[in-house]
From Swiss-Prot:
PANTHER family noted in UniProt: UNKEMPT FAMILY MEMBER (PTHR14493), ZINC FINGER CCCH DOMAIN-CONTAINING PROTEIN 29 (PTHR14493:SF158)
Keyword set, alphabetical order: ANK repeat, DNA-binding, Metal-binding, Nucleus, Repeat, Stress response, Zinc, Zinc-finger
Segments for region (Disordered): 320-341
Lineage summary: Eukaryota, Viridiplantae, Streptophyta, Embryophyta, Tracheophyta
Zinc in keyword set: yes
Function: Involved in salt stress response. May positively modulate plant tolerance to salt stress.
Major subcellular location class: nucleus
Lineage top rank: taxon: Eukaryota
Name the UniProt record assigns to this protein: Zinc finger CCCH domain-containing protein 29
Molecular function per GO: DNA binding; DNA-binding transcription factor activity; zinc ion binding
Biased composition (Polar residues): 320-337
Organs and tissues of expression: Expressed in roots and anthers.
Amino acid sequence: MCGAKSNLCSSKTLTEVEFMRQKSEDGASATCLLEFAACDDLSSFKREIEENPSVEIDESGFWYCRRVGSKKMGFEERTPLMVAAMYGSMEVLNYIIATGRSDVNRVCSDEKVTALHCAVSGCSVSIVEIIKILLDASASPNCVDANGNKPVDLLAKDSRFVPNQSRKAVEVLLTGIHGSVMEEEEEELKSVVTKYPADASLPDINEGVYGTDDFRMFSFKVKPCSRAYSHDWTECPFVHPGENARRRDPRKYPYTCVPCPEFRKGSCPKGDSCEYAHGVFESWLHPAQYRTRLCKDETGCARRVCFFAHRRDELRPVNASTGSAMVSPRSSNQSPEMSVMSPLTLGSSPMNSPMANGVPLSPRNGGLWQNRVNSLTPPPLQLNGSRLKSTLSARDMDMEMELRFRGLDNRRLGDLKPSNLEETFGSYDSASVMQLQSPSRHSQMNHYPSSPVRQPPPHGFESSAAMAAAVMNARSSAFAKRSLSFKPAPVASNVSDWGSPNGKLEWGMQRDELNKLRRSASFGIHGNNNNSVSRPARDYSDEPDVSWVNSLVKENAPERVNERVGNTVNGAASRDKFKLPSWAEQMYIDHEQQIVA
């Protein structure tokens, strides 16, 4: 150790020979003190001083170390106090200062560094205690080295080697600010929080509609706040510019409750179009995850906004197949968007049909009377009154006349309300209603491709649209063309004028109307003999000749028409036997046979 030869060379102009000669002549004892000070060997340090009275405790020697403020290594001139401060040797440092024979502000070599410079550049574990001891020994923190750096300036360069708490303490000690004053300032900075005045108009985010599930899932931190004055964002249920709690509307943006991995890294390139949740609020307030788990604090939860249920009755049901939450009954009852309006509500259009919602058709829920009530009330297009009147068909006119005879006039129908509809139309037999709802009934109607399945109107009236669609379809044009051969004088036939003699817009194959059709056909055959008629009649010269219908009607129609009329009069028990007449098909076949003959 002491006196041993070294092959290391100095970083200065000293050559190896000169360094070894100087060390062997003058610095042998000083080098031993530096080694004892670096190892914090107080007993050896004392023995060396006591055995060699000529050795000064403040004697400098060359020590191989890193230059202060630099990364270069070399032999630098240091005192035992500087080496003890550099390596954090507490016992040796206290002993040297206690002797009073060492200057804590001594400057060595051309670097002009002090013990404080060495203590800061050493970055030892006990750097704070070392600096306190030196400052208590009247060390000056304002001493400047050859590069113009104070000890506190060296801390900024070597701060990565010092723990955060130690760095702050060293900075406080070297800047001359007492710890108590600094602590008071830190407490003041922590206590400086923006306090807003009490705002009575600011709603409570946990009371009323603001605490419901629907508001939390679809409106909380989604809708922008309309308050122009400054207020506490944490107490406001609406979103503000630059707020981290901002959420996307899950009804507008189809994203899931799964956190976005890109958003966690900083920013998502997809923005609002991302299919994952951006942030904690979007993830836990998503309808698929909100209040699907119990809070660990349950009823003792003190959070302002909690994503979990505090009681079991607050848990939202989870779909077993998808794993996501379903609409809670409390939310569906409170939200007007989840409610379904009744089709019998006059003056408004129904949102969903009863069949779509799975509600069976019955007279009490308005399924059988939906078409009739809709014809009396404005449709969803809100057409004006004149256009509605122009769309009334002849069947509606006939129904009005029949209702007048039966005591159900327009005034009574006009006063229909949801309160008295059940009294007016509540006389259906339950057996007939079940027959109308049976699958065989629908399958029987579905085999007619040209007529849609419609519900029969009340009071035994047959559906005009179902019969007209079956008879007056593509074959009506063939009837019009082939009937021209039976006219004495061929005239261009206008299919649009082929109607009932009373001039109504549409008509069904009823018994009384067939008689009218028979008379109108005879007028077309015998010519325009208007003198034999006691009153002016309509000119039927342009209508097609349908005289061949007479024989067909006499042979086939009366029996079947009588049978259908009888079934109609019998009441609602025979409505399940409704089907399109087959005599129309037989009429077409017989007519073609006559043409071929």
